[in-house]
Amino acid sequence: MRVLIDTNVLADVLLGRDPYYDIAYSILTMCADKKVYGYMAAHSIPNLFYILRKSMTKEERREVLKDICQIVKVEGIDSFKIISALDNVDFDDFEDCLQEECAVAVSADYIVTRNAKDFVSSRIPAILPEQFLEKYKDIMQT
């Protein structure tokens, strides 16, 4: 099972955001335990670096993002993905379209996001974190 984890789910863990933290943490644990192959889009890193600025120092942000990179693989963004996303008129949000491009590139089964409605045009189905855990809770047991 391969999943691309959207920036908002990663931020839930890094910021300890309630009520989302526990579910997001469980998904990252599945990735860390290699029960699920987790990926994130490369542009999630600078987005998170910026999002975390109010709660962490630069040094803390660097360390925590390096830690995340040990848990989930980073899928790069190249000119092909950018052009393809720019050509894709089915997405209102360019950043979401880049997430989808990265999910396609890694042959993800799902994009795990709290904004599944933003991915209705996606070639990869989007799933809410709680739906993913409910659907694949048996993976947690093994």
Residue spans for each PLM region:
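Short beta-strand segments at enzyme active-site cores
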Residues: M40-A41, T113
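Acidic, PIN/NYN-like endoribonuclease modules and their adjacent C-terminal/linker elements
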Residues: R2, V104-T142
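Short, well-structured N-terminal submotif of metal-dependent ribonuclease cores
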Residues: M1-Y39, R53-E60, S121, K135-T142
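Active-site-proximal, substrate-binding regions of enzyme catalytic domains
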Residues: Y25, I45-K73, D78-F80
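Active-site neighborhoods of divalent-metal-dependent phosphate/nucleic-acid chemistry enzymes
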Residues: K73-A116
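A general alpha-helix detector
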Residues: V9, N47-L48, S84
